[in-house]
Regions:
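Extreme N-terminal starter segment of soluble prokaryotic enzymes
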Residues: 1-4, 49
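Acidic, low-complexity terminal tails and accessory targeting/binding regions
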Residues: 2, 38, 71, 75, ...
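Loop-to-helix element that buttresses phosphate recognition and phosphoryl-transfer chemistry
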Residues: 10-65, 114-129
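Short active-site segment of divalent metal-dependent hydrolases/proteases
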Residues: 11, 152-153
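Phosphate-coordination/substrate-recognition cap region in phosphate-metabolizing enzymes
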Residues: 36-103
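Active-site signature of alpha/beta-hydrolase-fold catalytic machinery across serine-
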Residues: 64, 155, 159
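Short basic (Lys/Arg) and small-residue
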Residues: 149
Length: 201
């Protein structure tokens, strides 16, 4: 299966440099343009199914792809961004001031750090991988697109490559980008990472 991983377009919190976990922000005008550009870039990929995180910013992006490809959007809860809990809406400076112990653990061992009032990155990775495996079971030879989020996509890529979870810090997933993972029984390959060629900044 070819799994095309699309990160949603820009929101106000992305622009402001604030944590956007499962907060339900909508796309900015720039974000809508990014989503439209992604949709245009995917027309020749032979996609048969569109999946999306349930969060508004992802669904909006997926709906633009849906309009372009003429395929319905199937919402999958496991594709949601990591639940950032009390950190949602904070800047990095805010987090370090209010949650110094958590941030120290996050810097040292992000896989074991549970976001205050939220979930761990390890749990988010587990559910993202579970969704990918369900897509593989249903479309073993197909091409599907999943619209999701920064941590969800980054940790899924690490899992596909059998990298430690902390390696997500070395995987950049920009807004409106496309990454492609080939999933086969016993063999996974990342064939495209963070492609932004379709975007005009």
């Amino acid at each position: 299966m070819r799994l095309l991983l699309v990160r949603h377009g820009e929101t106000d919190r992305n622009r402001e440099g604030r944590v956007l976990g499962q907060g339900n922000q909508t796309l900015t005008e720039k974000g809508r343009k990014q989503a439209a550009a992604v949709a245009g870039a995917l027309t020749e990929e032979g996609i048969t199914t569109i999946y999306s995180s349930p969060l508004k910013r992802a669904v909006e992006t997926a709906e633009m792809i849906s309009d372009k490809l003429g395929l319905p959007v199937q919402v999958v809860d496991d594709l949601a961004e990591v639940d950032a809990g009390a950190l949602d809406g904070m800047t990095s400076k805010d987090m370090r001031a209010r949650y110094p112990d958590f941030m120290a653990l996050w810097d040292r061992d992000p896989g074991s750090a549970v976001m205050p009032g939220g979930e761990s990155l390890a749990h988010a990775q587990q559910r993202a991988w579970r969704s990918a495996q369900s897509f593989l079971d249903e479309h073993p030879d197909g091409t599907v697109v999943a619209v999701s989020h920064n941590f969800t996509i980054g940790t899924l890529v690490c899992k596909a490559l059998e990298l430690p979870l902390a390696s997500f810090r070395h995987v950049r997933i920009d807004l409106g980008s496309v990454s492609i993972v080939e999933l086969r029984e016993g063999r996974n390959r990342v064939v495209l990472l963070n492609d932004r060629c379709h975007l005009v900044d």
